[in-house]
UniProtKB/Swiss-Prot annotation:
Binding site for Ca(2+): 26, 28, 30, 47
PROSITE patterns recorded: PA2_ASP, PA2_HIS
GO cellular component, one term: extracellular region
Co-factor binding comment: Binds 1 Ca(2+) ion.
Active site positions, chain numbering: 46, 88
Intrachain disulfide bonds: 25-114, 27-43, 42-94, 48-121, 49-87, 56-80, 74-85
Enzyme class: hydrolase
Protein name stated in the entry: Basic phospholipase A2 caudoxin
Hydrolase as UniProt keyword: yes
Record GO terms (molecular function): calcium ion binding; calcium-dependent phospholipase A2 activity; phospholipid binding; toxin activity
Organism: Bitis caudalis (Horned adder)
Length: 121
């Protein structure tokens, strides 16, 4: 769920998950246009992943995971829980890998500036 996702983000990036809650064109609710940078692209991919797991209620479902040697390990056998955990795990790793691209000017970015044709998932 979103709280667990936030905990993964904080653990992997050392930043508050709120730094990613309203960033670029895809971090936060909804999304349109072209991703603005690598960090925003992580959110685009995460949105696509949640879209594929939509029947699982990805924003609400509780799953199990742990941190092991600096990695996130998803622990559920349940297919829905595992799928959503994997979406969140991959995004948190992506944020950590793209920390260099984080641009404070893209936090609370106006959606009116999110233009261009959106890519397909």
């Amino acid at each position: 769920n979103l709280i667990q996702f936030g905990n993964m983000i904080s653990a992997m990036t050392g930043k508050s998950s709120l730094a990613y809650a309203s960033y670029g064109c895809y971090c936060g609710w909804g999304g349109k246009g072209q991703p603005k940078d690598d960090t925003d692209r992580c959110c685009f991919v995460h949105d696509c992943c949640y879209g594929k797991a939509d029947k699982c209620s990805p924003k609400m479902i509780l799953y199990s995971y742990k941190f092991h040697n600096g990695n996130i390990v998803c622990g559920d056998k349940n297919a829905c829980k595992k799928k959503v955990c994997e979406c969140d795990r991959v995004a948190a790793i992506c944020f950590a890998a793209s920390k260099h691209s984080y641009n404070k000017n893209l936090w609370r970015y106006p959606s009116s500036k999110c233009t261009g044709t959106a890519e397909k998932c």
